[in-house]
Design a protein with these regions (language model features):
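Short N-terminal mixed-charge amphipathic segments
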Residues: 1-71
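Residue-level detector of functional hotspots within protein domains
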Residues: 8-10, 84, 88
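Detector for Asparagine
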Residues: 9, 16, 27, 41, ...
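Intrinsic-disorder-associated interaction segments
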Residues: 24-31, 35-38, 42-49, 75, ...
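Intrinsically disordered, low-complexity acidic Ser/Thr-rich regulatory segments
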Residues: 65-86
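C-terminal charged interaction modules
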Residues: 88-163
Length: 163
């Protein structure tokens, strides 16, 4: 019987001191696509949070207290909601409970832990070179394998295809 052998092309990355793993399937180009989408969504979420902060500021503009507990809680809620949305997006890209793995020590100390936007931004920034390496090389190999120059006489220019 014939047997088809296929490279799994899985990349394992330790995400904490306990060596919990993020496993990337480098054959799945949609992971890279979702990561790019995540990056775009974070920018949108950041802009939305700024607008919500302005709304909170306007809502409490007539209160003279320097420190108003309700206003403070409203600001904190905006930050918490933004962080939770970013965590949901990260989990969509890298798998369920990805953030819990990365911040495992924090969750062990406090099960209700929510990382702030800075910690999440640093996490995303640390993932960029990993994603570029994992998927950039794959994209380059694919382009080299199927580039127009290697197809020789079957290659047509854009103008030839239009005619």
């Amino acid at each position: 019987m014939e047997r088809l052998e296929r490279a799994t092309n899985l990349l394992e990355i330790s995400v904490n001191k306990q060596d919990d793993l993020l496993v990337l399937d480098c054959n799945d180009i949609t992971v890279f696509s979702r990561f790019v989408h995540l990056y775009e969504n974070i920018d949108k979420m950041s802009e939305s949070a700024k607008k919500e902060m302005e709304d909170v500021k306007q809502k409490f503009k007539d209160i003279e207290d320097d420190v108003n507990p309700a206003q403070l809680m409203a600001y904190i809620n905006v930050h918490v909601m933004t962080s939770q949305k970013i965590m949901e997006e990260l989990d969509k890209v890298f798998g369920e409970n990805f953030c819990r793995k990365v911040f495992r020590e924090n969750y062990e100390l406090n099960p209700d832990f929510v990382p702030d936007e800075i910690a999440l931004a640093e996490l995303v920034d640390s993932l960029v070179p990993i994603m570029e390496k994992a998927y950039g090389e794959r994209i380059k190999r694919t382009q080299n394998k199927y580039n127009a120059g290697k197809r020789g006489k079957h290659t047509k220019t854009k103008d030839e295809l239009i005619q």
